[in-house]
Regions:
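Extended amphipathic alpha-helical segments enriched in small hydrophobics
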Residues: 300-384
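Alpha-helix capping/hinge segments and adjacent helical runs
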Residues: 2-5, 183, 260, 393-434
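A glycine-rich, basic-preceded beta-loop-alpha segment at the flavin cofactor/substrate interface
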Residues: 197, 236-252, 257, 267-299, ...
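A short, Trp-centered hydrophobic/proline-enriched beta-strand micro-motif
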Residues: 156-165
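A short core secondary-structure module
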Residues: 188, 192-246
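N-terminal glycine-rich flavin-associated loop
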Residues: 126-144
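Amphipathic, small/basic residue-rich leader segments at the start of a protein or domain
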Residues: 1-126, 145, 149, 376, ...
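C-terminal helix-coil-helix/basic helical segment that borders enzyme active sites and/or dimer interfaces
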Residues: 362-409, 422-423
Length: 434
């Protein structure tokens, strides 16, 4: 049984009735090559895959990830099959076109599919979860050589990417980052230091992992503006033979969390057992934070969508459970000892909780729709024969405005919705209570 529930009726209402996506966007470039019927069928396919993701979610929390003696990380076994399906069936559908900056899907529709996948199994979705922003970073800032080496591999998800900023002694204080990079020959750098809380930081789903590491080349200053972004592949691609060589990136421990145990949350060490080679993103020193702004915004979006997906599933599970769980008598017969038990959904306080959950879920989805709707509009305007730069800038600024608001508000509301879901469910029936 899947741990995930979704209502396609609600998602279709969001797309076709609230935002009228078919009328406003599917009739305009660059989204006029697919019909509403195509996207309705795509939602059905996404629900079927989300159901499989949901089945693996609870199993992955029980199995957890394990650090092996050889330094490799063992992830839940179900993830390998799911990863191959995700690559084969969904990467091209969800990803950006390799030759242009246009999205493969209208952002509004992409939101609904990501809500299903991230809500069904957020642990699995951390693997390869940084590829999308990594591709964007390389397109924006990478040198020709860096694009030739990394871009296609990341687009095909043959390799994956991770972002490495946090250090044990630093936390969120980037001025305390101590990872350093010393120049080598041929424009390369030797990186040394440790990073913690690196989600999906080591696994065998892909041939290679590219770490985007914040570190210092100039160690005489300790401001956040003296940080550089270094590309550190787990296995160094030999430019002559194409073979992948050990680049001395080690996982020294897996950090424990309350949940999301199927995600390999790693502590990584660079340069301890040998030289860890790196290249500087775009060959630009001390520009790491400026380069990584698009990454931060993508991470905020993902946080909001994960929260929405989990909250929506929690509400739907609660509504289903409340309709089946028999407890208490109808309020009109509370004093009648012979009165039958009724489903708890008939009790006023349970109705209040369910209505509150539904209202919060729809509010969160609607707020995210403001963001993705503005993004969809911006892409459509950019594809117009006569470009209205002022209008494009207006909608791009709206995206920037809504992004941190969505991250903060939706993640906070998701917590409250899931708290109410726990209250509705009460206790899990786990065997003979007598």
């Amino acid at each position: 049984m899947s741990a995930y529930k979704v209502s396609l009726r609600e998602l279709r209402f969001f797309l076709w009735e609230l935002h009228k996506t078919d009328q406003h966007f599917l009739t305009r470039a660059p989204f006029n090559d697919k019909s509403r019927a195509y996207y309705d069928a795509l939602l059905e396919r996404a629900r079927a895959f989300a159901d499989e993701l949901g089945k693996a979610y609870q199993a992955s929390d029980r199995q957890e990830c394990r650090l092996l003696e050889n330094g490799n990380v063992e992830i839940p076994k179900e993830f390998h099959t799911l990863w191959q399906r995700y690559k084969d069936e969904w990467i091209q559908v969800l990803g950006n076109d390799s030759e242009t900056q246009q999205p493969a899907l209208p952002p509004l529709i992409r939101q609904t599919i990501q809500e299903m996948f991230m809500g069904a199994n957020p642990a699995f979705m951390t693997y390869g979860g940084f590829n999308f922003p990594a591709i964007k970073l390389l397109k924006l800032h990478g040198t020709a050589a860096q694009k030739a080496t990394y871009l296609r591999k990341l687009q095909r998800y043959d390799w994956d990417a991770c972002f490495c900023a946090t250090e044990q002694q630093a936390g969120s204080d980037l001025t305390a980052v101590t990872t350093v990079a010393k120049p080598l020959e041929n424009g390369e750098y030797a990186v040394s230091g440790e990073k913690v809380y690196i989600s999906a930081g080591m696994h065998t789903l892909t041939e290679n992992t590219v770490y985007f590491v914040l570190g210092r080349i100039n160690t005489t200053t300790s401001t956040s503006y003296s940080l550089s972004c270094l590309l550190v592949p787990r296995f160094w691609p030999n430019p002559e033979t194409g073979e992948l060589e050990d680049n001395h990136v080690e996982c020294t421990s897996l950090l424990r969390k309350m949940g999301l145990k199927g995600c390999a949350n790693t502590q990584l060490v660079f340069g301890r057992s040998g030289t860890t080679r790196a290249v500087l993103l775009g060959d630009r020193k001390n520009a790491g934070l400026l380069q990584l702004v698009p990454l931060m915004n993508q991470a905020r979006m993902s946080t909001a969508i994960i929260g929405l997906g989990l909250a929506s599933s929690a509400y739907l599970h609660s509504a289903d459970f409340a309709g089946k769980r028999l407890q208490g008598r109808a309020i009109s017969r509370t004093s009648d000892a012979s009165a039958p038990a009724v489903p708890i959904i008939e009790h006023a306080d349970v109705q209040r909780m369910l209505l509150e959950m539904k209202a919060r879920v729809e509010g969160c989805r609607g707020l995210l729709g403001k963001l993705t709707g503005a993004s969809t509009q911006a892409f459509a305007l950019e594809a117009e024969p006569v470009l209205d730069e002022a209008q494009v800038e207006k909608y791009r600024k709206l995206v920037l405005l809504f992004t941190p608001i969505c991250k903060a508000f939706v993640s906070d509301q998701a917590w409250k919705i899931c708290e109410l879901a726990i209250q509705v469910h009460g206790v899990e029936q786990a065997g003979n209570l007598g």
